[in-house]
């Protein structure tokens, strides 16, 4: 026998109200800690650059003076006279060329290692990461003879060797990205009739864009900051910013010139790193 209870007035449930002060108070120490950590890291990075910034505009700085004795732009003029602008353009072009070669190769290798059964994976990983264990001098000295016998242009040889040295960084970065990549988006796009090219350009590349940007940045750093391979394989005919810095630092009385060239070498990667950090921020509706 069923018992029917009389229906009473329905009172809608309302969540408890609060001013949120307890929640904000619990988050305050975390924000303060992050702020302190950010300031500490910024100070740790920027404080060593303070003397460099002073030397940029110091014509003479004698010991034990705490500040430069004479301010001026002699260092800038000397750096320009030594070919800082062409060297900057060559370094930029070299970094971009290495990035353009090593990034797609690293992405292809990472996708194969992540999604396909590769025979002898340990041996393949050893070959991919061998440039990190091989001394740069030995590699450049040995490969330089081979490139000369094959009549490979010095610039092309520099790009090839530096791309091989950048390949472990791009492969590892993209392998981590492919490991976290959801292939269901690609399958859904194919179900909806997308071609292989459309899946690549409209689904896979946008989802992996932050990882591709990180890989390209690491490969750019390899080409931008290289000294030994560019010197040995390039034969001294391809002068870049690191070569100019080393040449100026080997002399005496060139502190202001070294400061200008060092700033030229440091600022572009720093600007790219800041841009990479801004680019890597995902919008609220990002599915990746």
Give the residues covered by each predicted segment.
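Hydrophobic alpha-helical elements at and bordering transmembrane segments
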Residues: 53, 84-92, 96, 113, ...
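Generic hydrophobic transmembrane alpha-helix motif, especially the helices
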Residues: 124-158, 165, 169, 213-214
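Hydrophobic alpha-helical transmembrane segments of multipass integral membrane proteins
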Residues: 85, 89, 93-105, 109, ...
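C-terminal transmembrane helix and the adjacent membrane-cytosol boundary/short C-terminal tail
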Residues: 2-24, 28-36, 47, 58, ...
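Membrane-helix interface segments
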Residues: 84, 115-124, 152-156, 196, ...
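Membrane-cytosol interface at the C-terminal ends of specific transmembrane alpha-helices
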Residues: 153-191, 198-204, 211-216
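Transmembrane-helix boundary motif in ABC transporter permease subunits
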Residues: 22-26, 96-128, 141, 145, ...
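Interhelical loop and adjacent transmembrane-helix boundary motif
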Residues: 8-12, 26-31, 61-64, 73-83, ...
């Amino acid at each position: 026998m069923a018992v029917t209870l009389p229906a009473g007035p329905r009172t809608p449930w309302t969540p408890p109200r609060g001013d949120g002060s307890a929640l904000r108070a619990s988050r305050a120490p975390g924000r303060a800690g992050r702020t302190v950590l950010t300031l500490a890291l910024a100070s740790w990075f920027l404080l060593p650059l303070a003397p460099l910034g002073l030397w940029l505009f110091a014509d003479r700085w004698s010991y034990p003076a705490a500040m430069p004795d004479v301010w001026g732009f002699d260092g800038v003029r000397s750096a320009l006279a030594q070919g800082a602008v062409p060297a900057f353009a060559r370094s930029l072009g070299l970094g971009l060329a290495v990035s353009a070669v090593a990034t797609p190769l690293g992405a292809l290798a990472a996708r194969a290692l992540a999604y396909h059964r590769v025979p002898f994976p340990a041996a393949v990983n050893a070959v991919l990461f061998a440039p990190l264990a091989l001394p740069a001098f030995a590699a450049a000295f040995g490969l330089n003879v081979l490139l000369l016998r094959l009549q490979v242009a010095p610039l092309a040889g520099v790009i090839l060797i530096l791309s091989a040295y950048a390949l472990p960084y791009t492969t590892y970065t993209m392998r981590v990205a492919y490991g976290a990549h959801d292939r269901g988006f690609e399958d859904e796009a194919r179900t909806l009739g997308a071609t292989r090219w459309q899946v690549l350009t409209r689904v896979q590349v946008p989802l992996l864009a932050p990882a591709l940007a990180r890989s390209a940045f690491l490969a750019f750093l390899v080409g931008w900051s290289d000294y030994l391979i560019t010197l040995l394989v390039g034969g001294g005919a391809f002068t870049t910013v690191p070569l100019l810095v080393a040449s100026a630092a080997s002399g005496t009385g060139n502190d202001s010139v070294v400061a200008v060239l060092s700033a030229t070498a440091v600022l572009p990667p720093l600007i790219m790193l800041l841009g990479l950090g801004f680019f890597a921020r995902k919008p609220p509706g990002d599915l990746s």
